[in-house]
C-alpha cells in the first residue's frame, strides 16, 4: 500500500525543488528573455540611434540619459566579451574628439558632469589616454568651485561636499557614477571617498523610514524613477567602494532598507508603479529596471539574501521584457519629470517609447546578470 504513494511523492518533491530553483535562478531564462538576447538587441538599437541633446541647439551636449545608455551598452559588451560591439560603440564615440566636439557637455552642472564616466570607461578598456584626458576633468571640476558659484553652492563646498549638490535624489547617481569611474581609472581614493561622504549626507537628509525618497523635500511623493536613481547610485557606489571605507556600513544600511521595502511594494506581476507606494498608479518601466538592477547586483555581490531577493529580481526581469517592442524600444517610460506637489501630475505624465531613460537600465540589468 505504501509503494503506490512513494513515486508520486518523489515527483512532487522534485517538482517543488525545481520550481523553487527556477524562482531563484538568475542565470537561466527562457528564449527571448536571456540577457544576451536583450542586451544585444538594445545595444544595436542604440548604435543606430541619434544623439539625445540637453538643448535643441546642442549647447549643453550629450544628454545624461544617452550617456547612461552608452555606458550600459559598453558594460554589457565587455561582460559579454563582444569585441565587435565594443568597437561599434567606440566608433560612435570617437567623433566627440573631432567633428562632434561641441557635443561634449560643459562642466557646470551635476547632470552634465556625469558625462565623464563614459570616456573613463573607454579608457579602462583601451588604455588610450585621450579618453582619460577627456573624462577626468569632469570628476575634478565637480569639487572645484567656479567663480560663478552661488552662495549656496560655495556653502556646500565649504562643508566638503560638491558645489553641485542640490539634494535632488537623482544627484546620487550622477555624482557617484563619475567619481567611482575616476577612482577606478586612477586608483585615487579621494574620488570615491568623497562620493561616499556625499551619499551618507543624502541618506541622512532624504531617506524615509520606509526606505524610499520623496521626489524632492517639498514634494511628498515617491516617484519611481527618482527612487530608481537613488537605488542605482547606491549600487554603483557599493560595487567599487573599498571595504575599509568608514561610510560603507551606513550606505549598505540605507541600500538594504530600500531593497527591503521595495520588495514589499512590488506589484503582483513583478513591476513597480510610477508612484512606488501606490499600486493603483500605472506600472513604469524605467524605475522598475533600476530597482531590478539594484537587486540583481545585491544578490550577486552578497549584499542581499539570495533566497529572499532572487525571486523578486527574477520576477521583475521577466515582467520587463514584454515591454520591449519589436524595434528594441522600451515602452511605458515616464517622460522627463520635474518635481511638482500634485499627485495627479505624476499619474498624468506622458508615457513614451524608446527613450534612453528606459533603454539604459535594461542594459544595466543585462550586464549585471552576465557578469
In which residue ranges do the predicted regions lie?
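Extended ligand-binding clefts on enzyme/binding-domain cores
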Residues: 169-170, 177-275, 281-292, 304-338, ...
Amino acid at each position: 500500500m505504501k509503494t503506490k504513494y512513494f513515486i508520486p511523492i518523489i515527483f512532487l518533491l522534485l517538482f517543488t525543488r525545481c520550481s523553487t530553483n527556477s524562482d531563484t535562478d538568475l542565470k537561466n531564462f527562457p528564449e527571448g528573455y536571456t540577457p544576451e538576447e536583450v542586451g544585444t538587441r538594445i545595444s544595436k538599437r542604440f548604435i543606430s540611434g541619434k544623439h539625445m541633446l540637453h538643448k535643441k541647439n546642442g549647447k549643453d551636449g550629450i544628454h545624461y540619459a544617452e550617456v547612461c545608455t552608452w555606458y550600459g551598452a559598453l558594460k554589457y559588451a565587455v561582460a559579454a566579451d563582444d569585441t565587435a560591439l565594443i568597437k561599434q560603440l567606440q566608433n560612435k564615440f570617437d567623433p566627440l574628439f573631432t567633428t562632434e566636439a561641441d557635443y561634449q557637455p560643459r562642466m557646470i552642472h551635476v547632470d552634465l558632469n556625469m558625462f565623464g564616466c563614459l570616456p573613463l570607461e573607454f579608457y579602462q578598456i583601451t588604455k588610450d589616454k585621450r579618453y582619460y584626458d577627456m573624462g577626468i576633468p569632469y570628476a575634478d571640476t565637480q569639487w572645484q568651485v567656479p567663480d560663478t558659484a552661488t552662495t549656496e553652492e560655495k556653502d556646500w563646498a565649504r562643508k566638503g561636499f560638491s558645489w553641485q549638490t542640490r539634494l535632488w535624489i537623482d544627484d546620487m547617481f550622477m555624482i557617484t557614477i563619475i567619481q567611482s569611474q575616476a577612482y577606478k581609472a586612477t586608483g585615487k581614493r579621494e574620488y570615491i571617498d568623497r562620493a561616499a561622504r556625499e551619499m551618507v549626507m543624502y541618506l541622512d537628509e532624504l531617506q524615509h523610514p520606509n526606505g524610499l525618497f520623496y521626489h524632492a523635500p517639498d514634494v511628498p511623493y515617491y516617484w519611481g524613477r527618482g527612487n530608481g536613481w537613488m537605488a542605482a547610485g547606491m549600487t554603483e557606489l557599493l560595487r567599487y567602494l573599498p571595504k575599509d571605507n568608514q561610510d560603507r556600513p551606513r550606505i549598505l544600511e540605507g541600500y538594504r532598507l530600500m531593497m527591503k521595502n521595495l520588495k514589499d511594494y512590488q506589484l503582483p506581476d513583478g513591476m513597480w508603479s510610477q508612484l512606488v507606494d501606490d499600486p493603483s498608479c500605472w506600472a513604469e518601466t524605467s524605475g522598475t529596471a533600476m530597482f531590478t538592477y539594484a537587486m540583481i547586483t545585491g544578490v550577486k555581490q552578497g549584499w542581499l539574501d539570495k533566497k529572499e531577493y532572487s525571486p523578486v529580481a527574477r520576477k521583475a526581469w521577466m515582467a520587463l521584457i514584454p515591454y520591449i517592442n519589436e524595434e528594441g524600444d522600451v515602452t511605458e517610460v515616464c517622460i522627463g519629470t520635474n518635481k511638482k506637489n500634485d499627485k495627479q501630475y505624476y499619474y498624468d505624465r506622458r508615457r513614451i517609447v524608446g527613450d534612453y531613460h528606459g533603454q539604459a537600465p535594461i542594459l544595466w540589468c543585462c550586464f549585471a546578470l552576465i557578469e
